[in-house]
């Protein structure tokens, strides 16, 4: 493994990425802990901007932490109109363009790294819509907002490793609607149902961390024998 893959940037590096609506605020974080660094970069998308969603959301940061502890470099960013990102909320259309721009930057800067996508709530919908187009190698969807105001019918479903995590006690997303929608898909993702977990995983963040780490373990090379 090359030094560039193992250490793509300083930990918690603040970034400004050029986007279609102007500047995009982002943070690139190196793998941490004892897991060997992998040639993988995961972009993690945040929840609904109009309800306070940002790249600093606790579900987003815990997901990114779990990935880094698995040896994966993470890239979080603020959609347009959030934090230092320029522009204004565009109900998913412009936000998809933002993700395209961030992915293009990631591939230009780290061409040897496989691209994964992840998202929470609104961000999971944006990431799902982009996965096939961007040729992501894996996808993590947390609290997919099935049954809310966004269209899931016209999405080109990815044929890649796909982990879906859903709290059974979600008060924002109808968990049963999520499960029913997943049942209609020709390729079933790996589904982790978390009993008693709310939308924001209150008091369940460590369980979420474990679910992410367990879910992606099979996507990564096995560690060398001692």
Where are these regions (language model features)?
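Gly/Ala-rich beta-loop-alpha elbow adjacent to hydrolase catalytic centers
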Residues: 118-127
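Catalytic histidine-centered segment of alpha/beta-hydrolase-like enzymes
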Residues: 87, 197-209
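Short, surface-exposed "cap/lid" segments of acyl-processing enzymes
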Residues: 33-76
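Acidic catalytic loop of the alpha/beta-hydrolase fold
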Residues: 168-173, 199-200
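Short beta-strand/loop motif that positions the catalytic acidic residue
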Residues: 158-159, 163-166, 170
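N-terminal cap/lid segment of alpha/beta-hydrolase-fold proteins
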Residues: 1-37
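Alpha/beta-hydrolase active-site loop
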Residues: 89-110
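Catalytic histidine neighborhood in serine/cysteine hydrolases
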Residues: 184-200
